[in-house]
Each structure stands twice: as C-alpha cells, then as structure tokens.
C-alpha cells in the first residue's frame, strides 16, 4: 500500500515534530471549571471548586468530575497535540529520541494484525539499515505482539490514533534527523528512503 501523493498532515516530509507541537503565538485556551459529583446520604451533590461544601467529610462519596467550559478560547492549538514515544516500561522517551544526533528510522505500525505479510520485507530493510549504522525503532501500540514477531529489536509504544494520523499505512518508515522528518515512505517506495539517506 502506498502513502497518499499529497500529504497535508502535520507529520509530512520536511516538518519538525517538535515545532508542530508548539502552541501558536496568541493562542487563548478554553477557560474551564471543574464540577464535582458526590453522593451524601443517598443524594447526589454537585459543586465546583468555588462552592465547596463547608460540611465536607467522609460521608461524601466521590462519583465523578467534569470539566465544564466557561469561556471558549480562540481555537488556536498546536498542530500535533498528543505525540509521545514510551518505552515498554512506560517511560516517556520522546525528548531522548529527538535528541538523537545521527539519522535514525522510526517505523510506525498501527497494529500487528497482518504483520506476517510485511515481516520479511521489514527484516530485510532493518538489516540493510543496520548495516549502515542507522538505528531502527518500531513504534506500535502492540509492543508485546511486536516483540513476539520481530524478536530483539528496539520497540517503543505510541497511541494507535497518533500512529494512524502520522502514518496512513502499516508500516510507514520515517527517516528522522532529530525531530525533523527527512523522508516518509511506505514499503513499496522504500528505495526513496535509501536514496535520501545515501545522498547525505
């Protein structure tokens, strides 16, 4: 499967992910208030932080809380709001990965279902990149399954929705320089990644 010819996403070739995560100048966020829901003596009680009950004690049983927008912001938000790379132990490694001074490849795979169909090609690409001393990192929400399929490779976890936005097909290869996307290809056009890599 090929990537779309025109990439209008914030994860397109040439973009810097860190720059895309910055809130635009002049952005005004929504103003919110927290509404708490408790029960006391079998009755539901709702209040916000400004009207906290004076008799609040252990007889109040927490039910829920909601953020209520009291004043709408101007809608200016970062183009990328939820990108993160986690280790298999849950440590956020995004900044450490982006601090990488050498080119590296992030391979995005939204799911491992059907991975058998691209496993051999991935392993061939992986070996070729390794022979050029290029670090390869598989990014997926399904780290356990990826480890079963691909063995001892570097795996990071990211949310499936984030991956779906960043990479329209599985797998998608990002040649990275720090946090900048130097090249972005799907498997059928992987030669373009090597051409770009070898032209540096």
What positions do the PLM features span?
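Extracytosolic and intramembrane catalytic regions of membrane-associated proteins
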Residues: 4-200
């Amino acid at each position: 499967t090929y990537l779309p010819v025109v990439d209008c996403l914030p994860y397109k070739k040439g973009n810097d992910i860190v720059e895309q995560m910055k809130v635009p100048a002049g952005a005004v966020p929504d103003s919110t208030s927290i509404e708490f829901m408790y029960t006391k003596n079998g009755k539901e009680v709702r209040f916000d932080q400004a009207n906290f009950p004076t008799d609040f004690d252990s007889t109040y049983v927490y039910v829920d809380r909601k953020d209520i927008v009291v004043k709408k912001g101007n809608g200016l938000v970062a183009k990328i709001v939820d990108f993160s790379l986690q280790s298999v132990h849950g440590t956020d490694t995004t900044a450490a990965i982006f601090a990488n001074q050498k080119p590296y490849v992030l391979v995005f795979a939204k799911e491992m279902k059907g991975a058998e169909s691209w496993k051999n090609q991935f392993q061939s690409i992986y070996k070729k990149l390794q022979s050029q001393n290029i670090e390869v990192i598989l990014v997926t929400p399904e780290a356990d399954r990826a480890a079963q399929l691909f063995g001892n490779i570097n795996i990071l976890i990211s949310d499936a929705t984030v991956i779906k936005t960043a990479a329209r097909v599985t797998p998608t290869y990002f040649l990275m320089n720090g946090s900048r996307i130097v090249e972005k290809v799907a498997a059928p056009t992987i030669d373009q990644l090597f051409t770009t890599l070898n032209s540096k």
